[in-house]
C-alpha cells in the first residue's frame, strides 16, 4: 500500500479542493492510502471516502505570506510540517501540498532530507508542448544560484524521471542557453555544457533556446533556479494571455465570432487543456529522500487528483530509490 501524506490546509481552495481530489483518487486507485493533515471538522465537510483514509487533526497551518524557513521551525504542528515529518518517520511514503512553495521546499530540505551526494535538490515540473507530450524542466526556483555541478546533477535527475515516470526510453536532455552553438553562454553555461557532453549516460542534444521549448525540442531542460523560474512564469503568463485574447476576441467579435466559437468549442477546450499543465501533476522537489510534490496554489480537485496519480507512479517505479542508488554509486 502506497501511503501519501497530504497537507489538507494548503492552497487557495483548501480544504475543499484538496479533499475532493483525494476522494476521487481513493475511488480510482485501490493501492493508495491517504493521511490528511489539517482541521478535522473542515476536512469532514468534504470527505466522502471511508476507507484507506485518516485525518490527523491540527489547528495550525502555514500561510502563503509566512517566511518559509521560520515557519517550518516555529510552526511545529502546522499541517505541512506534520505531513513532512510523517515521511521522515516512515509513516508515509510521499508528501503533497498546495501551500507555501518556499515552506514546502524547506520542509523537503530540512525534514525529509537530501539524498546522499546530491548537493542541491531542484524543483521540477512537466510543462506543456504543442504536441501534447510536454517536457521536464529543472530547476524551477528551488535555488537562487547554481554551479555547473548542480546543473549536471539536474540533468541526471531529470533524465531518471523522464525514463521511469514518463516512460521515455532515451530522454533528450537540453541545456537552456541564449543560443544553440556550443560556444554560447556565460561561464556557468559553458562549463555545464562540457560536463553534460562528457557524460555518456545522458542523451545530451546540446543547447536549447527558450523560444523552442514549447515546440518539444527536448524532453528534459536544465537551467539554474533563477532562469528556470523566470521561464516558468513566462510560460504561465503566455498561456493565460492566449486564453484571455481568445475570450476577448470572441465576446467582442459579434454574432459571427460567437457562432465560430460554438463550432470550435471542442478545439478550444482542447487548447485550454493542453496549456493547463497541472493535468500532468505537480512540481517535484527532486533530490530528497522521498517524493515531495507541490501542486499549484490555485489547484482544483482535478489538479490534486492528477498530482496524487503522479505520486503513485513515482512510488510504483521507485524512482527516488533508483536515484539514491545511482548517486551513492551502488
UniProtKB/Swiss-Prot annotation:
It comes from Streptococcus pneumoniae (strain ATCC BAA-255 / R6). It catalyses: a fatty acyl-[ACP] + phosphate = an acyl phosphate + holo-[ACP]; hexadecanoyl-[ACP] + phosphate = hexadecanoyl phosphate + holo-[ACP]. Its EC number is 2.3.1.274. HAMAP family: PlsX. This is Phosphate acyltransferase. GO terms for molecular function: phosphate:acyl-[acyl carrier protein] acyltransferase activity. The keyword rRNA-binding does not apply. Keywords: Cytoplasm, Lipid biosynthesis, Lipid metabolism, Phospholipid biosynthesis, Phospholipid metabolism, Transferase. Magnesium ions lead to a slight increase in the catalytic activity. The keyword Repressor does not apply. Pathway: Lipid metabolism; phospholipid metabolism. It is found in: Cytoplasm. Catalyzes the reversible formation of acyl-phosphate (acyl-PO(4)) from acyl-[acyl-carrier-protein] (acyl-ACP). This enzyme utilizes acyl-ACP as fatty acyl donor, but not acyl-CoA. It is active with both saturated and unsaturated acyl-ACP. It comes from the Bacteria. Belongs to the PlsX family. InterPro entries: FA_synthesis, Phospholipid_synth_PlsX-like. One of its GO terms (biological process) is phospholipid biosynthetic process. Homodimer. Probably interacts with PlsY. GO terms for cellular component: cytoplasm.
